[in-house]
C-alpha cells in the first residue's frame, strides 16, 4: 500500500555553480563515497552536475515523502542504478518500507519522484 509520496526539482546550473565553488567539500557533505566514486565516470563538469542534481532531487524527494528529515542526513540516503539503469534508493538507517524511485532530467532541470510503500502482514 502506498504510504507517502515526495517529489523535487533541481536547477542543474545551480549544482554546477556549487560544484565549481565548493567542489569536494560540497560533495562530501551531501553524497556517499559510492555516489562520488560513480560520478567519476563522467568526463565533463556539466555531466557530473547533472548526475549530482538528480541524486540531490531524489534525496530531497525521499525526505519529503518521509515527512521529516529528523534523524537522517543526506549521506544516509544513497542512490544507485542497477545494471539496466533503473535507479534505487537505500537508507543506511533502519527503514523497512519499500521505496520506489523515478529520476529524470531535461534541459536545465532534474526531477525525482519517490513512493514509499508499506506492506501489512494482515491479509
Swiss-Prot record:
Catalytic activity: apo-[ACP] + CoA = holo-[ACP] + adenosine 3',5'-bisphosphate + H(+)
Xref: Pfam families: ACPS
Cytoplasm found in the keyword field: yes
Keyword Metal-binding: yes
Enzyme Commission numbers on file: 2.7.8.7
Subcellular location per the Swiss-Prot or TrEMBL entry: Cytoplasm
Enzyme class: transferase
Gene3D superfamilies, per the entry: 4'-phosphopantetheinyl transferase domain (3.90.470.20)
Signal peptide stretch: none
Main location group: cytoplasm
Residues at which Mg(2+) binds: 8, 60
CC cofactor: Mg(2+)
Source species, domain of life: Bacteria
Protein name, as recorded: Holo-[acyl-carrier-protein] synthase
